[in-house]
Amino acid sequence: DALAVVARGLGGTVHLAADVIRRALETREDARPIIVLNAQQREGALREELWRCGVDVDKVMARHRAAETGRNERRALYATGGVVLCGARAACVDLLDGTLDASNIKGILVLDAERCAESSPEAFVVRLFRDRSTQGFVRAVSEAPERLGGGFAKLAKVVKTLSVSTVALWP
């Protein structure tokens, strides 16, 4: 479990996210999903980067909007595995009502990790995942190092909130 902090403007978030996803998909024998939070604005770039890495994007990547997708449809989507892009609030609801079983999640990837506070939906998703599952990874990426340096121990709070043990700082 790790938090990677990269310099703003280098496009590192998409590259790191694609690398995490590609590596997790290398062990594709199980049908457990990889949940990607906060990817709404980067979906196109993420698809393109995964395609460049040789991943069959159409086969392994799905997205759902909770308001447009029914509960049974989301349950089937999670059961097929692969990469699921969804909002943190939708993931919270699905974890709480049993649509998404935390023990069946391969891992969670949180983009824009600097936004995670103790009361954020992303933090709640990670807490639910950690409380209900002993397996699986949590990886996070931030492209706003200045937001992690401001305030009192902001980086330490984000690390604690996301339950990660390692921080990687990239230029």
Kindly give the residue locations of the regions a language model identified.
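Conserved catalytic network of the ASCE P-loop NTPase/AAA+ motor domain
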Residues: 24-29, 54-57, 75-79, 99-103, ...
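Conserved motor-coupling elements within RecA-like helicase/translocase cores
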Residues: 68-85
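Conserved Walker A/P-loop ATP-binding site and its immediately adjacent core
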Residues: 3-54, 88-93, 121, 145-147
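SF2 helicase catalytic motif II
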Residues: 81-84, 88-91, 96-147, 152, ...
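Conserved RecA-like helicase motor-core motifs
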Residues: 32-33, 55-68
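Short, hydrophobic beta-strand segments that form beta-sheet elements in well-ordered domains
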Residues: 35-36, 63-64, 138-140
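Interdomain motor-coupling "hinge/lid" segment immediately C-terminal to the ATP-binding subdomain
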Residues: 156-170
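N-terminal regions of ATP-driven nucleic-acid and macromolecular assemblies
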Residues: 1-2, 151, 168-171
